[in-house]
């Protein structure tokens, strides 16, 4: 309920201010974590789009201006400028109230972040490869895909794709 209220308040504030866009703070690391989480925990291939129309608030768009900025760069900029981020639902702050007392969160996102760090030890390109994987989708090599909520199977196009 808390985060839903926050979202509604954000939209209402934007609407009252005459805005048609809301800028969100998601960054590059959020994007690659979301891609991998979708595969590992959601049985799907999808990404976090840099710009999209709101499905719940007519005429409102969501934009992610920090989509290509690394989390470490944002934190470096924050520290360089002696800034402190407010506590938020996405747990961007280093000290969050939803973390365990030992500072380790049990979230799937944190597990995914740690998994990516481990994979990076083996392959230094793993982060960019995850990001590019959703740009380089070849539908002819996918068993099935969804478009506008309708599932399509490769056999629908099998004879066309000779």
Where are these regions (language model features)?
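Aromatic/hydrophobic pocket-lining residues that form π-stacking "cages" and hydrophobic walls in ligand
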Residues: 9-10, 74
